[in-house]
Amino acid sequence: MRIWWLLLAIEICTGNINSQDTCRQGHPGIPGNPGHNGLPGRDGRDGAKGDKGDAGEPGRPGSPGKDGTSGEKGERGADGKVEAKGIKGDQGSRGSPGKHGPKGLAGPMGEKGLRGETGPQGQKGNKGDVGPTGPEGPRGNIGPLGPTGLPGPMGPIGKPGPKGEAGPTGPQGEPGVRGIRGWKGDRGEKGKIGETLVLPKSAFTVGLTVLSKFPSSDMPIKFDKILYNEFNHYDTAAGKFTCHIAGVYYFTYHITVFSRNVQVSLVKNGVKILHTKDAYMSSEDQASGGIVLQLKLGDEVWLQVTGGERFNGLFADEDDDTTFTGFLLFSSP
């Protein structure tokens, strides 16, 4: 139908061209309605193969695949053959003893042997019978003087003898009764000024610092903060007090407990005398101890942590102190 409309339009145009010499051109007509869509053309031929494109960016990793199904259980293998153990045989019977062989021929006579050792002495024989009494012998010599006999009875009292010499002076007799108190005597002259009595002295107080807190275990605690040690009886390098004046001493210690538990002992010459233990409970705590000791010259006293590093919570800073004190109460001869 569209083809017919197309041919008609061409024909009209051709007629108009031929009549231009004789007719005037008229006004253009009103455009007709759009024609219907034409039939689809045939498929074009395949084009030439294009160049290979650039490689695309790697894709994202795929999600893990699902687990495969379990395989079927294999058949049970045949049981292996076990060789049967043989039966133990019976014990054989004991054989009969053999017959005695014939007696051997006598050997030649040996040489004469050496003389044997003397045999042991025989036992004592029985006592023989008493023989007949012999004739009387001659008179013997006079024997020695016999021992002195016992004293005889006391004789009668004799006449008084002459007067003897005077004997030595006897011991002093007991003091007599105290006499009546006498009159007060005159005042004596003033005596000379005596020597001033010098009392022996020994004392110290030491403490820990930030550098010496949390001391090591099982060794003397070295207190390096000197509060009083005028006589140098406490050795800061060794951490020990040494007795220079024999007598009775008082020792005391005051501990600030922080961060860890505390377990200390006061030691005298290597022997633990006094023990103190305190458990840390999340805030600062205090522990202390004191004792009176009799010391001799050269005795040593110190404090030490016992039980390991878990019990060395002895603390010190600008606001907290841990101290060790000792002083002489009185000397002894």
Curated annotation (Swiss-Prot):
Tissue: Expressed predominantly in adipose tissue.
Keyword Secreted among UniProt keywords: yes
Residue ranges of every copy of the Collagen-like domain listed in the record: 24-82, 95-154, 155-191
Sugar-bearing residue positions: 73, 127
Modified residues (5-hydroxylysine): 73, 127
Keywords: Collagen, Glycoprotein, Hormone, Hydroxylation, Repeat, Secreted, Signal
Region entry Disordered, spans: 24-188
Cellular component, GO, one term: extracellular region
Compositional bias per record (Low complexity), positions renumbered to this chain: 26-40
Residues with the 4-hydroxyproline modification: 31, 34, 40, 58, 61, 64, 151, 160, 175
Residues spanning the signal sequence: 1-19
Domain of life: Eukaryota
PROSITE patterns hit by this protein: C1Q
UniProt cross-references to InterPro entries, sorted A to Z: C1q_dom, Collagen, Collagen/C1q_domain, Tumour_necrosis_fac-like_dom
GO MF term list: hormone activity; identical protein binding
Principal localisation: secreted
Pfam assignment, any one: Collagen
Domain C1q span(s) in chain numbering: 197-333
Subcellular location per the Swiss-Prot or TrEMBL entry: Secreted
Biased composition (Basic and acidic residues): 42-57, 69-88
Quaternary assembly: Multimers (predominantly trimers). Interacts with ADIPOQ via the C1q domain to form a heterotrimeric complex. Interacts with CTRP9B. Forms heterotrimers and heterooligomeric complexes with CTRP9B.
Job description of the protein: Probable adipokine. Activates AMPK, AKT, and p44/42 MAPK signaling pathways.
Protein name, as recorded: Complement C1q and tumor necrosis factor-related protein 9A
